[in-house]
From Swiss-Prot:
Keywords from the UniProt entry: Carbohydrate metabolism, Chitin degradation, Chitin-binding, Disulfide bond, Glycosidase, Hydrolase, Plant defense, Polysaccharide degradation, Signal
Protein name: Chitinase 2
Family matches, as SUPFAM superfamilies: Lysozyme-like (SSF53955), Plant lectins/antimicrobial peptides (SSF57016)
Molecular function as annotated in GO: chitin binding; chitinase activity; endochitinase activity
Taxonomic superkingdom: Eukaryota
Protein encoded by which gene: Cht2
Tissue specificity statement from the Swiss-Prot or TrEMBL entry: Expressed in roots, sheaths and meristems.
Disulfide bridge partners, by residue number: C35-C50, C44-C56, C47-C74, C49-C63, C67-C71, C110-C172, C184-C192, C291-C323
Residue span, Chitin-binding type-1 domain: 33-73
Organism, as annotated: Oryza sativa subsp. japonica
Length: 340
């Protein structure tokens, strides 16, 4: 039989346990990333900056180096309503169109045959709902065309006299052929795992440990320890490309913001000749090697894919397609892209 004092003690302990459980739950919720690539491309409320780590705030820690979105406030463009599941990428890219766009990806001569599936593309896109879900229908289609245009160049198996033309052979490769190195650079934040190599893999030919690390963290996979997943798991492969597409890096906007009209050039951008359009995306992806020195066959190839895909969607390409006269964002390649 318990005494009143014992009963009071038990009640106090029960209350303390309840408070501890509540505190743990609140702490877990507080740790969940709020925005950016870590949260499926979400933007912060009330025009807050999204830090490189996926948190919302207003100080330089959030709005400074690595800021992912709304780094100078929302600007004049309103944040779009997130698409409902019924308005996902599949609603503008039905299976038959996907097959026509990537016509020869499963050709017997393509090393990636059978890898890049429609199902994997949709599954990866669902993790980034703003991709192909921002703006009106034409803008949504143009973003998919631009994404497939850039990634088709990175994975092309085409040649000038190829059947159905050179721009029907995107997604022929899934990893770099004969990589010259292990693409490991010393990094305390993204250390290379023993024996692992970070050469180009996937639609964007993701390269270097400093890209595999943050890409893996954003999609919930340890790619520093398992870089081969980008060439063996098609959904992971597409997700890494979409992570790169959706994520601003350094002084570069995201490709997503450029093609959807959410990016406005700064005075420095204008002075560098960087104007809104597909050409800036090429600059983001590989400007250090391809932009700013006049006509370049690689840039023309990227444009060729994009024009074909826009034609298949029945939309215009917009202006400023090349980066021939744009100063690069960096002095070198942003991804360490592989030339097939």
């Amino acid at each position: 039989m318990s005494t009143p004092r014992a009963a009071a003690s038990l009640a106090k302990k029960a209350a303390l346990v309840a408070l501890a459980v509540l505190a743990a739950a609140l702490a877990t919720a507080a740790r969940a990333e709020q925005c950016g690539a870590q949260a499926g491309g979400a933007r912060c409320p009330n025009c807050l900056c999204c830090s490189r780590w996926g948190w919302c705030g207003t100080t330089s820690d959030f709005c400074g180096d690595g800021c992912q979105s709304q780094c100078s406030g929302c600007g004049p463009t309103p944040t779009p309503t997130p698409p409902s599941p019924s308005d996902g990428v599949g609603s503008i890219v039905p299976r038959d169109l996907f097959e026509r766009l990537l016509l020869h990806r499963n050709d017997g001569a393509c090393p990636a045959r059978g890898f890049y599936t429609y199902e994997a593309f949709l599954a990866a896109a669902a993790a980034f709902p703003a991709f192909g879900g921002t703006g009106n229908t034409e803008t949504r289609k143009r973003e998919v065309a631009a994404f497939l245009g850039q990634t088709s160049h990175e994975t092309t198996g085409g040649w000038p006299t190829a059947p159905d033309g050179p721009f029907s052979w995107g997604y022929c490769f899934k990893q770099e052929q004969n990589p010259p190195s292990d693409y490991c650079q010393p990094s305390p934040e993204w250390p290379c795992a023993p024996g692992r190599k970070y050469y180009g893999r996937g639609p964007i030919q993701l390269s270097f440990n400093f890209n595999y690390g943050p890409a893996g963290r954003a999609i919930g996979v340890d790619l520093l320890s398992n870089p081969d997943l980008v060439a063996t798991d098609a959904t992971v492969s597409f997700k890494t490309a979409l992570w790169f597409w959706m994520t601003p890096q350094g002084n570069k906007p995201s490709s997503h913001d450029v093609i959807t009209g959410r990016w406005a050039p700064s005075p420095a951008d204008a002075a560098a000749g960087r104007a809104p359009g597909y050409g800036v995306i090429t600059n983001i992806v590989n400007g250090g090697l391809e932009c700013g020195h006049g006509p370049d066959d690689r840039v023309a190839n990227r444009i060729g894919f994009y024009q074909r895909y826009c034609g298949a969607f029945g939309i215009g390409t917009g202006g400023n397609l090349d980066c021939y006269n744009q100063r690069p964002f960096n002095s070198g390649s942003s991804v360490g892209l592989a030339e097939q």
